[in-house]
UniProtKB/Swiss-Prot annotation:
Taxonomy, superkingdom: Eukaryota
Organism: Chlorokybus atmophyticus
GO biological process, one term: photosynthesis, light reaction
InterPro entries reported for this sequence: NAD(P)H_OxRDtase_bac/plastid, NADH_UbQ/plastoQ_OxRdtase_su3, NDAH_ubi_oxred_su3_sf
Record note on quaternary structure: NDH is composed of at least 16 different subunits, 5 of which are encoded in the nucleus.
Membrane-spanning ranges: 10-30, 64-84, 89-109
EC number(s) stated in the UniProt entry for this protein: 7.1.1.-
Protein name, per record: NAD(P)H-quinone oxidoreductase subunit 3, chloroplastic
Family stated for the protein in its record: Belongs to the complex I subunit 3 family.
Gene: ndhC
Length: 120
């Protein structure tokens, strides 16, 4: 007896979903133009010759602000469905959301006290 009997259609879907991108990329590689030259591999800067290095070092503070932004952006993504279905979920879900928010607020206070949000 096959245990996963009800999942036959899902297996077919999974195989097709994996094959479509592979076939599309293979077909595009077969029909693409095969010419190129040194101009093709140069960096394009608004139609003029590139000046200087292509790599630029960014200040680490940009990364800290980006990291804090991503954390609180993900928080918003998690809190929106909770806020929409708050009336049906009850008091336990409210406590879970408070725990989630308090963990994030503790992290924000920690980053603030460590000076991660200072721009000096």
């Amino acid at each position: 007896m096959f245990i996963l009997k009800g999942y036959d259609s899902f297996l077919v879907f999974l195989i097709i979903a994996c094959l479509i991108p592979v076939l599309a990329l293979s077909a595009s590689k077969l029909v693409r133009p095969k010419f190129g030259g040194p101009e093709k591999y140069t960096t394009y800067e608004s139609g003029i010759e590139p000046m200087g290095e292509a790599w630029v070092q960014f200040n680490i503070r940009y990364y800290m602000f980006a990291l804090v932004f991503v954390i609180f952006d993900v928080e918003t993504v998690f809190l929106y469905p909770w806020a929409v279905s708050f009336a049906q979920m009850g008091f336990i879900s409210f406590l879970e959301a408070l725990v989630f928010l308090s963990i994030l607020i503790v992290g924000l206070v920690y980053a603030w006290r460590k000076g991660a949000l200072e721009w000096s």
